[in-house]
Protein backbone atom coordinates (compact mmCIF):
# COMPACT_ATOMS: atom_id res chain seq x y z
CA UNK A 1 0.00 0.00 0.00
CA UNK A 2 1.37 3.39 -0.92
CA UNK A 3 2.04 5.99 1.77
CA UNK A 4 -0.61 8.48 0.50
CA UNK A 5 -3.21 5.71 0.63
CA UNK A 6 -2.26 4.81 4.19
CA UNK A 7 -2.41 8.48 5.19
CA UNK A 8 -5.84 8.85 3.57
CA UNK A 9 -7.11 5.79 5.45
CA UNK A 10 -5.80 7.13 8.74
CA UNK A 11 -7.44 10.48 8.15
CA UNK A 12 -10.71 8.84 7.13
CA UNK A 13 -10.67 6.67 10.25
CA UNK A 14 -10.77 9.86 12.32
CA UNK A 15 -13.37 11.48 10.09
CA UNK A 16 -15.98 11.68 12.79
CA UNK A 17 -15.13 14.15 15.49
CA UNK A 18 -16.69 12.27 18.39
CA UNK A 19 -14.99 12.98 21.67
CA UNK A 20 -13.06 10.60 23.87
CA UNK A 21 -14.55 12.31 26.92
CA UNK A 22 -18.24 12.56 27.72
CA UNK A 23 -18.95 16.19 28.54
CA UNK A 24 -21.72 17.19 30.93
CA UNK A 25 -25.00 17.93 29.12
CA UNK A 26 -25.42 21.18 31.07
CA UNK A 27 -23.43 23.63 33.16
CA UNK A 28 -23.94 26.98 34.85
CA UNK A 29 -21.99 30.19 34.27
CA UNK A 30 -22.70 33.26 36.42
CA UNK A 31 -25.91 31.63 37.65
CA UNK A 32 -27.21 31.09 34.10
CA UNK A 33 -27.91 27.51 32.99
CA UNK A 34 -26.17 26.55 29.73
CA UNK A 35 -26.77 23.54 27.49
CA UNK A 36 -24.21 21.47 25.64
CA UNK A 37 -24.55 22.67 22.05
CA UNK A 38 -22.03 20.18 20.67
CA UNK A 39 -18.69 18.53 21.29
CA UNK A 40 -15.93 17.08 19.18
CA UNK A 41 -12.25 16.31 18.84
CA UNK A 42 -9.57 18.60 17.39
CA UNK A 43 -7.34 16.69 15.01
CA UNK A 44 -3.96 17.86 13.75
CA UNK A 45 -3.32 15.70 10.69
CA UNK A 46 -4.18 12.27 12.17
CA UNK A 47 -3.41 13.05 15.81
CA UNK A 48 -6.07 13.87 18.40
CA UNK A 49 -5.08 17.09 20.18
CA UNK A 50 -8.03 17.90 22.46
CA UNK A 51 -11.71 17.27 23.03
CA UNK A 52 -13.88 20.37 23.12
CA UNK A 53 -17.44 21.26 24.12
CA UNK A 54 -19.43 24.44 23.55
CA UNK A 55 -22.16 25.48 25.98
CA UNK A 56 -24.85 28.06 25.14
CA UNK A 57 -28.15 29.24 26.64
CA UNK A 58 -30.12 27.70 23.76
CA UNK A 59 -29.05 25.24 21.07
CA UNK A 60 -28.07 26.59 17.65
CA UNK A 61 -27.02 24.98 14.35
CA UNK A 62 -25.03 27.81 12.74
CA UNK A 63 -21.82 29.59 13.61
CA UNK A 64 -23.49 32.96 13.14
CA UNK A 65 -26.22 32.10 15.66
CA UNK A 66 -23.68 30.81 18.20
CA UNK A 67 -21.56 33.94 17.91
CA UNK A 68 -24.58 36.29 18.02
CA UNK A 69 -26.34 34.59 20.94
CA UNK A 70 -26.35 36.84 24.00
CA UNK A 71 -25.61 35.84 27.56
CA UNK A 72 -22.89 33.69 29.10
CA UNK A 73 -21.06 31.07 27.03
CA UNK A 74 -18.49 28.41 27.83
CA UNK A 75 -15.87 26.46 25.92
CA UNK A 76 -14.44 23.38 27.70
CA UNK A 77 -11.38 21.42 26.62
CA UNK A 78 -9.58 18.22 27.63
CA UNK A 79 -6.03 17.72 26.34
CA UNK A 80 -5.54 14.37 24.60
CA UNK A 81 -1.80 14.69 24.04
CA UNK A 82 1.03 16.75 25.48
CA UNK A 83 0.99 20.25 23.99
CA UNK A 84 3.35 23.00 25.09
CA UNK A 85 1.68 26.09 26.48
CA UNK A 86 3.57 28.23 23.97
CA UNK A 87 2.37 26.09 21.04
CA UNK A 88 -1.21 26.31 22.30
CA UNK A 89 -0.98 30.09 22.68
CA UNK A 90 0.51 30.47 19.21
CA UNK A 91 -2.17 28.21 17.70
CA UNK A 92 -4.84 30.42 19.28
CA UNK A 93 -3.09 33.48 17.83
CA UNK A 94 -3.05 31.93 14.33
CA UNK A 95 -6.74 31.03 14.69
CA UNK A 96 -7.61 34.56 15.78
CA UNK A 97 -5.66 36.06 12.85
CA UNK A 98 -7.17 33.67 10.29
CA UNK A 99 -10.78 34.31 11.31
CA UNK A 100 -11.05 37.96 12.29
CA UNK A 101 -10.67 41.29 10.49
CA UNK A 102 -7.32 42.97 11.18
CA UNK A 103 -8.90 46.10 12.66
CA UNK A 104 -10.79 44.05 15.26
CA UNK A 105 -7.69 41.94 15.99
CA UNK A 106 -5.64 45.11 16.52
CA UNK A 107 -8.34 46.56 18.77
CA UNK A 108 -8.04 43.51 21.07
CA UNK A 109 -4.27 43.09 20.93
CA UNK A 110 -3.90 43.58 24.71
CA UNK A 111 -6.40 40.80 25.50
CA UNK A 112 -4.85 38.54 22.85
CA UNK A 113 -1.40 39.02 24.37
CA UNK A 114 -2.80 38.24 27.82
CA UNK A 115 -4.39 35.05 26.44
CA UNK A 116 -1.07 33.95 24.95
CA UNK A 117 0.70 34.77 28.23
CA UNK A 118 -1.76 32.57 30.17
CA UNK A 119 -1.02 29.53 28.02
CA UNK A 120 2.67 30.31 27.60
CA UNK A 121 2.97 30.50 31.39
CA UNK A 122 2.22 26.78 31.57
CA UNK A 123 5.06 24.64 30.26
CA UNK A 124 2.69 22.05 28.78
CA UNK A 125 -0.84 20.74 28.89
CA UNK A 126 -0.65 17.03 29.72
CA UNK A 127 -3.15 14.42 28.48
CA UNK A 128 -6.26 14.58 30.65
CA UNK A 129 -5.72 18.16 31.82
CA UNK A 130 -8.58 20.58 31.34
CA UNK A 131 -8.87 24.18 30.30
CA UNK A 132 -11.91 26.35 29.72
CA UNK A 133 -13.07 29.81 28.71
CA UNK A 134 -16.17 31.39 30.22
CA UNK A 135 -17.70 34.58 28.89
CA UNK A 136 -19.98 36.65 31.14
CA UNK A 137 -21.57 39.83 29.73
CA UNK A 138 -20.25 43.06 31.25
CA UNK A 139 -17.41 41.11 32.93
CA UNK A 140 -15.41 39.53 30.11
CA UNK A 141 -13.75 36.18 29.47
CA UNK A 142 -12.14 34.16 32.23
CA UNK A 143 -9.65 31.43 31.36
CA UNK A 144 -9.35 28.33 33.52
CA UNK A 145 -6.66 25.66 33.69
CA UNK A 146 -7.56 22.58 35.73
CA UNK A 147 -10.62 24.44 37.03
CA UNK A 148 -8.59 27.36 38.41
CA UNK A 149 -9.15 30.87 37.04
CA UNK A 150 -6.07 32.35 35.39
CA UNK A 151 -6.26 36.02 36.29
CA UNK A 152 -9.12 38.46 35.94
CA UNK A 153 -11.72 38.43 33.15
CA UNK A 154 -10.46 39.87 29.84
CA UNK A 155 -12.12 41.85 27.10
CA UNK A 156 -15.71 42.33 26.10
CA UNK A 157 -18.33 40.53 23.97
CA UNK A 158 -16.44 41.36 20.77
CA UNK A 159 -13.27 39.73 22.15
CA UNK A 160 -15.13 36.50 22.98
CA UNK A 161 -16.70 36.54 19.51
CA UNK A 162 -13.15 36.69 18.14
CA UNK A 163 -12.21 33.68 20.28
CA UNK A 164 -15.27 31.70 19.12
CA UNK A 165 -14.27 32.28 15.50
CA UNK A 166 -11.10 30.21 16.06
CA UNK A 167 -13.41 27.18 15.88
CA UNK A 168 -16.52 28.62 14.20
CA UNK A 169 -15.05 31.11 11.72
CA UNK A 170 -14.49 30.86 7.96
CA UNK A 171 -11.10 29.13 8.47
CA UNK A 172 -11.74 27.03 11.59
CA UNK A 173 -9.01 25.14 13.42
CA UNK A 174 -10.72 21.90 12.30
CA UNK A 175 -13.78 21.66 10.02
CA UNK A 176 -14.95 18.40 11.59
CA UNK A 177 -14.77 20.00 15.02
CA UNK A 178 -16.74 23.03 13.81
CA UNK A 179 -19.47 20.74 12.50
CA UNK A 180 -19.50 18.76 15.76
CA UNK A 181 -19.79 21.91 17.91
CA UNK A 182 -22.85 22.93 15.88
CA UNK A 183 -24.44 19.47 15.69
CA UNK A 184 -26.25 19.45 19.02
CA UNK A 185 -25.59 17.26 22.04
CA UNK A 186 -24.63 13.61 21.40
Roles of regions detected by a PLM:
Residues 175-186:
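Cysteine/selenocysteine-centered motifs that mediate thiol-based redox chemistry or coordinate metal-sulfur cofactors
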Residues 1-8:
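Sec-dependent signal peptide recognition
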Residues 18-72:
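N-terminal secretory signal peptides
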Residues 8-17:
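Hydrophobic h-region of N-terminal signal peptides that target proteins for export
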Residues 145-148:
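Short strand-turn-strand beta-turns centered on an Asx-Gly dipeptide
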Residues 152-177:
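Flexible glycine-rich active-site/ligand-binding loops centered on an Asp-His dyad
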Residues 60, 64-138:
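Mid-length scaffold segments of soluble, non-membrane domains
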Amino acid sequence: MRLPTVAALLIASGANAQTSKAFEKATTVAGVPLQLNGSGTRFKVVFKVYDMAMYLRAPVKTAEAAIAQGGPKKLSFVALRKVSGTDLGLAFMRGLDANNPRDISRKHLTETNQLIAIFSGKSAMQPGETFAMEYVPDQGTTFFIQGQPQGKPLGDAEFFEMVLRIWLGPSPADWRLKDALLSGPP
